[in-house]
């Protein structure tokens, strides 16, 4: 027994001694990279270097200055001039020296946007860790170097909310003096929104240099930039599964990093009604998944403001007359009659596209009174609004045709049970709810958005829907139908959301049976990037339709999404959408790959759990991960 204990003690002593030596070695080892990078033919090439710290040329330095656009995302549309030199500085020496704007409210927004910008820069600085970082750069030299930012918004740029006609253009200049002691940044924009985008571009001209242990900024830059499309959106469904406010904030952070400007908030559906309304508390009481899974008024107001200072509008969708069910159970007990029909009806595939079923009872006049209250409160808590999404998706006519109250209503009006009769009834409903929706105090009459449907078909659209009142969001596959071309030819403004490229929930398997999801395979970032709205329009109409084609929107239905998977399913594919809609490049995805991979790194650095696209090795060894 004694010998056994001696052996154990010897082993333990050896382990402790080895650990002590290892700790001592790690404490003394500089952990500097043995590699440097050089820019060769617009590619950062990895090389071995000696131990001389003066030879260090870090990957971040190379990526900032290599190639015409460095690591800017989305790529600017007009002019990009980036020098091949950087200067180092301390974050405390980065300041907003001047913010010229026509009103105090715009100045306040500029200050908030600058604070967000500076916070994003700070996220790029790693936490101090003596095991891995040594203080290399001369702190006195850093303290002397200053970065001054001046922002000028034109006298006409009083807008503080985004509209379809808002000018989002900007001009950005970075100039460093001969002694590298002062870098002046000037931003000129017509509106706050353009200035905010310029700050995002500026943040992408700054990187942490691990070789120097310091922040660095490109010394000389000129950028002239404006978006190709007015509407650049993401649909977030928070009704199929509840998404927390914090997760929505991360989504908005990522959108801002990519200059996307519209969050389409699909906030209610048949499955749940998580929106608390003061005038109708029973809606969320009966319709939410739990008391903790509700968006109250302050939550909504917070999201709207959080989005606004990041250059994003929030467009709420109240889906009707389809996708309505939970939340409406109380109306019969209150003597208002049944307002939702076919709710949870079986077999569900007969009455709706997916379970649970449910549609509004458009034969019950009390329905309009409740809808008026819903619209008035939504208009208030989401204010200011210039756009409102009325839904109109996947209305099942068989549901109405098997509802006695609706069939009797048709008979009383002398109508039969034909498809045209139901479409007449549906279009009458749509006209009524549009007229009921209150005007906004700032923007006036709100323009409606509808999904493409039987009402928007080539034979019916101009009969039922006034193109001056409605924008049509076109889903479905462009390969299977000419919906977009037909709508454009009839003079409708269109938002493209074709399912064969921009439905990001596809490819994860069916959630009602085994096998593939009904919307097909996974849409990789390359397919998202290559989906050009102008090409779609040109193929179907012979024209790019620049006035009518407002832009596009990636869609994430959340039947298989919650907080845990949201970021990875949206990002970085949402970034591919962003460059398509901001820049609308003539080339395909391949020339964008290096910048795209870096943008994914940037999103992760900022706290967005964006999915991995390639091994880290590919990020460090550009253009070597390919298949020919």
Question: Which stretches of residues belong to each language-model region?
Answer:
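Active-site neighborhood of glycoside hydrolase catalytic domains
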Residues: 351-471, 477-484
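Active-site-proximal beta-strand/loop segments in catalytic clefts of secreted hydrolases
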Residues: 153-154, 189-190, 238, 267-268, ...
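Loop/turn elements at helix/coil->beta-strand transitions in domains of secreted/extracellular proteins
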Residues: 258-263, 309-313, 383-387, 441-448, ...
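Flexible, acidic glycine-rich loops studded with aromatic residues
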Residues: 447-628
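Feature activates predominantly on carbohydrate-active enzymes
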Residues: 163-369, 374-387, 554-557
